[in-house]
Amino acid sequence: GTAPKRMIKEWLENRSDKHLFEDSVGNDPSLMDVIKMVHPKPTNKNREAFYAYLLGKTYDATLLPLNVQEFEAFKKTPKGTRTVPNVPFQMLTALDLSTKEWTEIARNAKWHMTRMNLNTFERHGVFNENGMVDLIATRLRSEKDIKNAKVFPYQLFVAYMTATSAPVKVRNALQDAMEIATQNTPKITGKVFVGVDYSGSMTAPVTGNRGTATTTVNCNQVASLMAACIMRNSDD
């Protein structure tokens, strides 16, 4: 309908170039799909060049937003001699990056991104770089960051179970973070009784059997974790 399209056009017009570029990460639909669907009218030459860039058309590179220019220059510069641009992590992972560049990404990563990419950092040698193990461990167990991230214990439990090759300091930090994250779970008032099902079916993975997409965490582990969180936050 015309009303939804008009709303999307207004959203595109009011979105800054920086944020719009960050929004271009992802598919189904992609930002390119959205632009093709609503046909927004550029308000200036810079936005016209930016839309052309996002649509894969010919554009004037000098009119592109600064972060887009930096990203394109980064891709054309030999690895090891360039500065990592301030763009979403997902835009960089498909590129051929040096250990130095991966280390820079890890050093500047937000809390959630750090938690979700421990194996990636390990695989690219980040933990072998001076000071990075302590930096990552300190970030992971930061009480302030854990509360701001509103992370739940099960997310940290999954990270712990999958980061089997991470340094001991990092894995210990995940355990500390898990304990702190219990504060992010709801508190139930009154007398609380917890009964955990330990029948044979509870040994199944949480995701079910999905081939390579099967989680390493099973149902009884999640049930036990939920029970522990309730006990931590309940007085009786």
Task: Show where each model-derived region lies.
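Long lumenal/extracellular ectodomains of secretory and single-pass membrane proteins
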Residues: 1-218, 232-236
